[in-house]
Amino acid sequence: MCSLSTLSPNFSNAYGSKSVSSTASRFPCWQRSNETWKTQSREVIHWTYVVRCKEVLNEARQGHMNLPHVTLQNDLCEREALKEDMPLLNEYKMEECIRYIKNMLGSMDDGRITVSPYDTAWIALIRDIEGRDIPQFPSSLEWIANNQLSDGSWGDEQFFLAYDRLLNTLACVVALTYWKVHADKSEKGILFIKENISKLGDANVEQMTCGFEVVFPALLTKAKDLGIHGIPYDAPVMQEIFATKDRKMERVPKELLHKVPTCLLHNLEGLGNVDALGKLDWPKLLKLQTPKGSYITSPAASAFAVMETKDKDCLAFINYVVNKFNGGAPTVYPVDIYARLWAVDRLQRLGISRFFEPEIKNCLDYVYRFWTEKGVFSARESEFCDIDDTSMSIRLLRLHGYDIKPNALKHFKKDNMFTCYVGQGFESPSPIFNLYRASQVLFPGETILEEARDFSYNFLRERLEKNDLLDKWLISKHLPDEIKCGLEMPWYASLPRVEARFYIENYGVDDIWIGKSLYRMPEINDPVYLELAKLDYKRCQTQHQLEWRHIQQWYEDSSLEEFGISKKDLLLAYFLAAASIFEPGRSGQRLAWVKSQIMSHILTTYFSIKEASSSEQRKSSTKLENEQGRGQSRKTTIQRFITIFFGSLQEIMRDANEQIGKDISNLLFDIWRVWLEKLGEGNEEIQEVELLVSTINICGGHIASKDILSHSEYKTLSRLTNKICHQLRQLDMGNEELIAIEWRKNKTTDSIYREIEKDMQLLVQLVLQDSSNGISKDIKQTFLLAAKTFYYRAYFPTEQIGNHISKVLFEPVV
């Protein structure tokens, strides 16, 4: 489930700081800090500030939190243990998985998909084009003979769906009987049909295979014409299927069928001799083929066209498919767009996409090349498009910086509803869920995405409440949990490690897709994906646990409890860093994140700082003004924190130098100096987020000069992120038990919620849109990551955050 709840540490006050206005604060003591900053370039910088203690209640010792017991492979927490090359899990196995997946992604071609007995049978029915009394594709007939299941049926051996098994089996029996071969196999197939036909009456109509009510009656008619005995043609369920087809055909506008590509073309083999449609106009229909010669990528429909017209383009398509699948044929082909989109989506959600960046770029470049103003379909160059592939394209292409507009979604909107494609009988959860996911990556003013978000959220919420989540396109036991989590954890509040942990536990290796027959796609559902995800997660988690021990040691050595920082504050800070920047090689950035956030929090909450005047700088460093009679103790506290502060900055610099091989001392000093100056000016809205983001980017090697920090786009991002996070912090400091409920209720009506939403949309646009003015994608992404952690804290209640922390950082992946 989305809550990821197993352990429940008591984080009753996870953000244990108390806001005190500047007018209410008292300053019992001040201490002049005159520090010398020595850089590796031997430059000496003098830094003089006046530091005063605020009279603030220290809540660090209040309450109690039981941290999970952590068992590590290496109990030592030496600096070397924090490096990426530490001896963790089976590196060789990870490399093996990575090679396997790289090879798969690099050889996608038109996509991998399992064979459909139904479509293969239609191809086997094609007579020799030259007029001889032999099959044009004998290898297809051979495939049928070699792939009958032990119970006499044809279909997916591991999963029984009555629609699928009966349709496949009837088609194969018709093909074998037509050519008068393998009578024994035909008899076994007929017996299976006879014994199982009644199961159609109990089958879920939501999972009826595509076009079943159109193509199954056509096959029954063909079987009857061939004189196949033993099939219960007059059974009540059979009569109901024929009646359903008649009702559907009466609603079909004949002129539309021959004018534009519609879903009916996909079931063309079921439209012959339909009274309501009359005779098919083949000269018009042949103009509706795809460039590859198929009818909406259906081998069965294309095989029927070959039988009726001997069209050379259709025949070329069938030849291509049969050669590709050694006599067999899938239910749709190609699936080049679909395979690439869903493979990238799975790799990202499993948290392993960083291993395949070149391959992912190639996949998305390919999809972008075939993007149209109407959207896309599962195969390239198709005039017929659907909302599922179009939504996934919008989301993934936009997240990776491609210039993509969502206006294609207008083609799937009618009145106030969105549909998978024109002519869809009823909507199904999985395409609408992908529409919902795409709708969250919206830019300001994109009304179509706002409408899509509202519709999809309400549609899915209603289905969840009714427990009505059977899907027309996908059979997955994890789909309900996936949808539930998607609604409970909006994209703005989603942290990469939280999403990965959830998806690892819910990734469907055995998911089955529904077409005219059931099919599987190895590039989407592969156990090697899951194996690599688990190995990598364990590796990252072990690294994070080592770092957590290091952070705790820093906490103890620095006596941070004395400055109002509790261990739960520390754990929350580390969790947010590790859940956002999780890669083992980015240890320095995580540690910089935590230490910077803790120190800036102490400085803004418990001290008042201003730059020393010239007269104050001339005073002795030991001068003390005891305003409240407790000066000596205060002086000691201040001096100790100054030592901790500069020592921690030195550690951050040293870690960064080891990681990126650069001296960042000047840059780091400069951003902290600027921030302290602003803090000293008494600004009510302290720009901690700008300081945090700049520290992370500098430690990651993304900022090499001060010019970046003064760049206009960088300043715009800083101002906007500071504003968003300041507003989110105000929400976060409200009544924590009610905040999540109020957020959901008020975000579309209350002004502050609306303002946050609009600002987040603008931030997403600034971060995701490509810019050629010197600000790298890595730099911009850090702003979004930081903003999402604040959104996460404001959105989720403390107990749920505690569950996430336990699950993500401490509980092992099984």
Swiss-Prot record:
Biological processes annotated in GO: gibberellin biosynthetic process
Locations listed in the record: Plastid, Chloroplast
Pathway(s) of this molecule: Secondary metabolite biosynthesis; terpenoid biosynthesis
Reactions catalysed: (2E,6E,10E)-geranylgeranyl diphosphate = 9alpha-copalyl diphosphate
Positions annotated to bind Mg(2+): D386, D388
GO cellular component: chloroplast
Cofactor names: Mg(2+)
UniProt cross-references to InterPro entries, sorted A to Z: Isoprenoid_synthase_dom_sf, Terpene_synth_N, Terpene_synth_N_sf, Terpene_synthase-like, Terpenoid_cyclase/PrenylTrfase
Pfam (any one): Terpene_synth
Motif (DXDD motif): 386-389
Keywords, alphabetical: Chloroplast, Isomerase, Magnesium, Metal-binding, Plastid, Transit peptide
SUPFAM superfamilies in the cross-refs: Terpenoid cyclases/Protein prenyltransferases, Terpenoid synthases
This enzyme's EC code(s): 5.5.1.14
First and last residues of the transit peptide: 1-52
Domain notes: The Asp-Xaa-Asp-Asp (DXDD) motif is important for the catalytic activity, presumably through binding to Mg(2+).
Family stated for the protein in its record: Belongs to the terpene synthase family.
PANTHER family cross-referenced by the UniProt entry: COPAL-8-OL DIPHOSPHATE HYDRATASE, CHLOROPLASTIC, ENT-COPALYL DIPHOSPHATE SYNTHASE, CHLOROPLASTIC
Protein name: Syn-copalyl diphosphate synthase TPS3, chloroplastic
Organism: Vitex agnus-castus
